Structure formats: structure tokens, C-alpha cells
């Protein structure tokens, strides 16, 4: 469950601009603010089932966006390569502060 929540949080971060305001709100409340379906339903004066259906549809949309655009997958790959680069530089060029500063700048761009 935690892995799914983390994945949805990342997908939401990458693709939230493609969602409707209501979809953004439901997803934000459910995944970021940890509201229950009942709490969201009460806030929007709709049924719990309506909230559940909306969230499930939105999750499917986010997965479809990721399938087509791969922003999260590319992010993970860049992060992995950055870690490998840091390890390599540490082993081969451990004394080169300028090189470490440049890597740090690259990391901060993410």
C-alpha cells in the first residue's frame, strides 16, 4: 500500500496539470492530506462511492499518462544514474570539490 501511495504521489506531481480541478482536489486530499473517502465525501457533499469512483478513474488516468509520457520512469532512471555518478566520482575523483559542486547543482535541478 505504501508503495502504491508513493507512486501515486509522484504521478500526481508529474501530471496534476492534466487533471480537472475536482480530480486534483480529490487526489490531493486522499493521497497528500491522508483524508478518508468518507471525509472527502462529507466535504464535497457527495457519496463515498462517488469519491471512490473518481479517485479510481483518476488513478487510471495518471497511469495512462505515465504509460505514454514516462516522466516518472525517466525521473527514476536519472536519479539512479546520478547516484552511480556520485559513487564513481567519489571513488575516482574524491578530492575534486568542483566536480562534486557540479553534481550537487545537477541534483538540485530535479
UniProtKB/Swiss-Prot annotation:
Signal peptide: none annotated. SUPFAM superfamilies: Sigma3 and sigma4 domains of RNA polymerase sigma factors (SSF88659). InterPro entries: RNA_pol_sigma_r3/r4-like, UPF0122, UPF0122_fam_protein, WH-like_DNA-bd_sf. Pfam families: UPF0122. NCBIfam families: PRK00118.1-4, PRK00118.1-6, YlxM. Belongs to the UPF0122 family. Might take part in the signal recognition particle (SRP) pathway. This is inferred from the conservation of its genetic proximity to ftsY/ffh. May be a regulatory protein. This is UPF0122 protein GWCH70_1086.
